[in-house]
Amino acid sequence: MRKILVTNALPYANGDLHLGHMLGYIQSDIWVRFQKLQGNQCIFVCGSDTHGTPIMLKAKSLGITPEELVTKYSNRHLQDFTDFEINFDNYHSTHNSLNKEIVEDIYNKLNNKNLISKKAIAQAYDPEAKMFLPDRFVKGTCPKCKAEDQYGDSCEVCGATYDPTELINPRSVISGQSPIQKNSEHFFFDLPALEKNIKDWIESNTLLQPEVANKLAEWFEQGLQSWDISRDAPYFGFAIPGTNEQKFFYVWLDAPMGYIASFKDYCNKNNINFGDFWGDSSSESELYHFIGKDIIYFHTLFWPAILSSTGYKTPTSVFANGFLTVNGKKMSKSRGTFIQARTYLDNLEPSYLRYYFASRLTSRIDDIDLNLEEFVTKSNSDIVGKVVNIASRCAGFIYKKFDATLSGEIFDPELESEFSKNHDAITQAFEKREFAHAVRLIMALADKANQFIDYHKPWQLAKEEGQEQKVHQVCSQGINMFKVLIVYLKPIIPSIVAEAERFLNIQFISWADAPKFLINHKIDKFKPLATRIEKEKVDKILEDTKKMLENEQAPQSKKEEPKLDIAAECTFDDFMKVDLRIAKITEASHVEGADKLLKLILDLGGVTKQVFAGIKSAYKPEDLIGKHTIMVANLAPRKMKFGMSEGMVLAAGDGKGIYILEPHEGAQPGMRVK
């Protein structure tokens, strides 16, 4: 049994997931499910990437805290993953005390090895927004290939990396103004000092994709540069120790460490030895990172350099996938093809997209095109027309005529052997992430199964006298070929296969036992496992996406400013006549005969006052004892039938509720409110 740890790139928690995201997660989920079916101990972890200026600014624009924003999107992401049948063993967050501990520990180890240095650098600064600009908040023309509208850290056209100050005609994404340069002291990781470590890792990595190896060679030829791992306040993230929260770790330093934190969290929950998988001596374990091609730089240069110098196992390999296009073009909101994961799920089952992606995915870093017409055709033809159709054509005869029991003999051993002989080739295709090849092999077998049924025509044989045994054997072989196919498809379309397993009355079949036919086995009544996709469903996805864009672009109706019924104006001198004091409620009790009043004894720092307050509808007396409030201490005493009231406690209300005012922690009884 192999010990395998798989991570997937952490989704950034400032927006919803779209189908381009799902391409990478579906790819890794298929591979993990395949490994588990083989009996390997394969652990799959992920989590939310939650730090950085984009999150800070978006939260501010929405009037919420960054923590509230990332919690909202983390929950939505996890629901999308669950509904797309992405089965993580653990889902964590980078904004977590465990990750903070790991980040600081790794930073200290790097610092102790003299791999961290400080120097003043010129930073892009937005004078209008009054803040330093992160790389991705500066856009301009690439200094290498001259492509326009590129981010401040890397070019999406030529792949070059650079500093924001190198951009031609830079502009602030926040204000649109040209940023100025302003000096700031930053922390740097000495990447060039670890060049040999990185090259040793590359040479030992037999699974590295050729495209990645070529890109690495190009970066080495350009020369490695020290990496700026810090950002200036204000910033949402972890403060660098000893900087008085003026400098923070760059999100790309703490984000990959979220892999470690998520796995360590899993280990803590499941009593697993972390070192067996990710210790520097865990040679028997395998570690794989699945990522998008846009973050190869961070995962194949910085990450192995950091891991190799801090006592962690370096990745066995890093697998990158390409981008998603729709109908041959870049995803577009205006065309309705920038499809969110939830929009798809609101209209179609996840199995269809999982299958379509699998039918296109290879081990190469190719962009995948979601051709919507082909998507409908392939789903209907392959899943419904080929695979599910085998069972639907044979199940009724077995269930009705033969007591739902499969034959004790194999009708066509040669065909059975052909299904068995393909097992190794399909296994190798899944192992190498050549899912498109695996799907072609599986569908070729499905074609043979349907040809077998077409040739023998059990529906005609059933009408002929004396052909009962042949009908039984032909349909039993059909059901068994279906059984082999669904096991092969289990990593790809797990929910459909789960329904098929219930129909076949089987609990679990290992990958190794996939080709074995069921003999004298009782099945259940067949129910439809998948329905055809109607074109209208796909059209609705596009329509819903366009409507979403229209709602985003629609001008927000100006809200009427709330009107307050303000009392008559008073002068400052008038206000200063009111002596407001902090008071501690030492006693509280009901007032006999009064429907609205509570009797309060207030301590003003050695001076005691009695007050009758109309707050009975909102508070129980026992809940008030020990609380601090604010009272008008110099109000003329008022004689009431219940006793003397020597002041008034302050409370707010809107006619629906009453809320007594409580001072901030630290205010003491007797202090004057000014």
UniProtKB/Swiss-Prot annotation:
MF annotations from Gene Ontology: ATP binding; metal ion binding; methionine-tRNA ligase activity; tRNA binding
Binding site residues for ATP: 333
Coiled-coil region: none
Cofactor(s) needed by this chain: Zn(2+)
Motif window: 'HIGH' region: 11-21
Oligomeric form and interacting partners: Homodimer.
Function (record text): Is required not only for elongation of protein synthesis but also for the initiation of all mRNA translation through initiator tRNA(fMet) aminoacylation.
Official protein name in the record: Methionine--tRNA ligase
Chain's gene name: metG
